[in-house]
Amino acid sequence: PVPDSSFLRDP
């Protein structure tokens, strides 16, 4: 499954 890409976004 595709991992959550939320960590790719800047804070």
Swiss-Prot record:
It is found in: Secreted. GO terms for biological process: neuropeptide signaling pathway. GO terms for cellular component: extracellular region. Keywords: Neuropeptide, Secreted. It comes from the Eukaryota. Belongs to the FARP (FMRF amide related peptide) family. FMRFamides and FMRFamide-like peptides are neuropeptides. This is Extended FMRFamide-10. It comes from Striatophasma naukluftense (Gladiator).
